[in-house]
Curated annotation (Swiss-Prot):
UniProt name for this protein: Very-long-chain aldehyde decarbonylase GL1-6
GO molecular function: aldehyde oxygenase (deformylating) activity; iron ion binding; oxidoreductase activity
The EC number(s) this enzyme carries: 4.1.99.5
Domain Fatty acid hydroxylase residues, every copy: 139-273
Domain of life: Eukaryota
Record's subunit section: Homodimer.
Enzyme class: lyase
GO-annotated cellular components: endoplasmic reticulum membrane
Keywords attached to this entry: Endoplasmic reticulum, Lyase, Membrane, NADP, Transmembrane, Transmembrane helix
Gene name linked to the record: GL1-6
Amino acid sequence: MASKPGPLTQWPWNNLGNYKYALVAPSAAYSTYRFVTASSAAERDLLNFMVFPMLLLRLLYGQLWITVSRHQTARSKHKIVNKSLDFEQIDRERNWDDQIILTALVFYLVSATMPQAQVAPWWSTKGMVVTAVLHAGPVEFLYYWLHRALHHHWLYARYHSHHHASIVTEPITSVIHPFAEEVVYFVLLAIPILSTVATGTVSVVTANGYLVYIDFMNYLGHCNFELVPKCLFHVFPPLKYLLYTPSFHSLHHTQFRTNYSLFMPVYDYIYGTTDKSSDELYERTLQGRDEAAWRPDVVHLTHLTAPESVFHNRLGFAAVASNPLGAAASGHLLRAASAVASPLLSLFASTFRSEANRLDKLNIETWVIPRFTSHYTSKSDGYKVSRLIEKAVSDAEASGARVLTLGLLNQGYDLNRNGELYVVRKPSLKTKIVDGTSLAVAAVLNMIPQGTKDVLLLGNANKISLVLTLSLCKREIQVRMVNKELYECLKQQLQPEMQEHLVLSRSYSSKVWLVGDGVTDEEQMKAQKGSHFVPYSQFPPNKARNDCVYHCTPALLVPESFENLHVCENWLPRRVMSAWRAAGIVHALEKWDGHECGGRVTGVQKAWSAALARGFRPYDDHHHPGITHDGRGGL
């Protein structure tokens, strides 16, 4: 929103959500019907028929630019503006497809009102020349002066400030404008197409090719990484005045009063508004920063979960990734798209970099193993997954990372003995492997309501259930279990004086249930009304009861100084991080020398106190009484 929104700021279909595509449906259906039922090829309106396919292609093209741009800026080598992107910008730019819908509606209107457009051929050389000349002349000239006018304080405050709210640009930032401003741009950019229609030189390729050109140049200028090769300007020096670069336009977003041109910098050079640092910035960003200067201090290794999680990561759908997994209203559409994209993941033989964050002087990256939860639970895929994790550990060490955290199922005991396998195979491993058990247990303890005297522990026997049980016993909290195998497994690993707090019971009467993996809906139905389900697992339990309280998986709120966080971690809310991921960051900040994997434990109280001291805060979606002065939580 502009700082002082003017008239016609909101788009007409602002309140329709994704139903706005229904505005195009009648015209698209009628266009297809006319094309199919035409008695001869001469009667087919090619330009009208291509409107809907072009709408779909432009949506796909825009998404590809988002993915490529975010992949490049996560790598950071040719990144231009190295500032933080936030959730506010993601929300502001989520309607980037509005201008594509508006284009489709305008094309349908032109086709219906101008008979010349209904007989457009596939190709017209004259039309291509007319379009190129009119764009380089009137369009670029008028846009330059319009753009300068929009930077007048009255128009800027009411309209153009909405676009300039994004200092760190993404490809789709290019089309984020108030409705009235976008309409003016449409009138301006319609000059070449309407002129070819009026002169009878319009063609399907010319009209749609011009749209592709506009999209390409818009996305290029706002992608925030330099990719235009220097050889183009060496081969044809005048190109410098006909083609802007991402670094050239980025200066307009950081300096505001320079580099006003649309796509051709010639008018900035003519009227003396070229930023003096344009050439220097281009050379510097094209060469790229020394990757050693951006070595990750912490790498968080995660993986995909359900098929729709393909799009719920930073390289996927920006608006979807900025909300918890499963919160998107278009869930069915996501699952359908995932069915197409998921098989392609098998072609990836290594991790990909998804996020790059910063806390204080710590560089933090998130790497994703392109495999789903189903691959981790499959015996046939277990070895392949283990090799991918081992390669990621080697890559992290080669990159100079001090700490690597194993997220989700990457720390499974059957897979790698909670990460210990990689330390055993390489005793000289400099990168510290952290499974985050201590901080996860501390987060669970903090969610247990104050005054609790006994809990019911359910789930599979694993490292975190053992450490959690030990911590509860030290606090003289009775730990009940109904599973004899789990009871015997945990009891034999506790000291005799602690075993008295373990109880094998047939009763499900405890008001606090600590649930891990493997808890069924049938077991949940045995809980009393109002019982608290507190997960200690990586994955949240299925919510089988409406009359009970379900807490989130172990997590913490990140410090305010945590930069460049604009995606949600799986099912967690914004700016909330899983305890396992946070553990690695704390480990690096404290410069602890040692692994936390296998049977090694940092210490529950030690990890919790350090996390709080570093700015992390307890998180519980039901906001039970918080931590006490000694950091022990409600217990």
